[in-house]
Amino acid sequence: GIILELADSIQENLGTDGLYIDQIAAAAPYPCYAHNHPHPAGGGEFWYHAYRDMMLDLRRDHLKDGNVVFSEENAECYIPVFDILLTVNTPHSPSCRIVPLYPLIYSDRTLTCAYTYTPYTDVTKGDFRHENMQCLLYGSQLGWVDPRLLWVNDESAYEAKFLKNLTEFRKKQHDVFIGGRYVREFVPEGDNPYVNVPVFGGDYMVKGSEWISPDGRRVLYVVNSDSKAHKVTLPTGKKITMQPISAKRIDL
């Protein structure tokens, strides 16, 4: 099929380390009433079965060793056939609170990238830093951003530095984020400013999450998205100082 031919061509001719296949984990399984199709009229499960069979074929006979394949969004039924899911469909507004239900349930079964759309025109208003802080705490891959918005000026270069800090920190957390379980989010007490984040509403500059590694170790992650240092208190009672635009791991 066309998808399998493209998979071969992209890996062979472009030398990529993986494949991104749009829409599969995002497309709704609309009912089909075609009389010549071998399923009950109005059935929709054929979408899943057909995509699953195609992806199993791709992984078995077309995906190069060591390469990954990921798709758009995060329909649960496709977790077994993709390595990474691009989760950018999280709705948010100042009038609602995001509940990290997906990582709570599936963090030990799949890897995610991002969790909502990145700013389209300006990364210096606060929402970009807030999003990347949340991404790290959820265990998601970072970097879902238009690079043309970074390094435009000193302000945007600072945002790029924050992203780089978190990215370099995250690459050392594979022992937890790969196969580990996201347990909860928490807000450290103490010197922790509460601010208005554009398109998100009020939230804290320093936030944290608790994980359990695949071998059962409890780990806390804390991120300071502010340009100032803050001394905060963890749920364990321990006091720590978070440097500007930084992340920290605490093994319990």
What is each PLM-predicted segment?
Residues G1, A27-R52:
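Aromatic- and acidic-residue-enriched carbohydrate-binding clefts of CAZyme catalytic domains
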Residues G1-Q23:
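An active-site-proximal structural segment forming one wall of the substrate-binding cleft
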Residues L4-A7, W47-M242, S246:
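Active-site-proximal substrate-binding groove within the catalytic cores of carbohydrate-active enzymes
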Residues L19-Y20, Y30-P31, H230-T233:
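Extended hydrophobic-aromatic, low-complexity segments
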Residues I21-P29, S71:
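Conserved beta-strand positions
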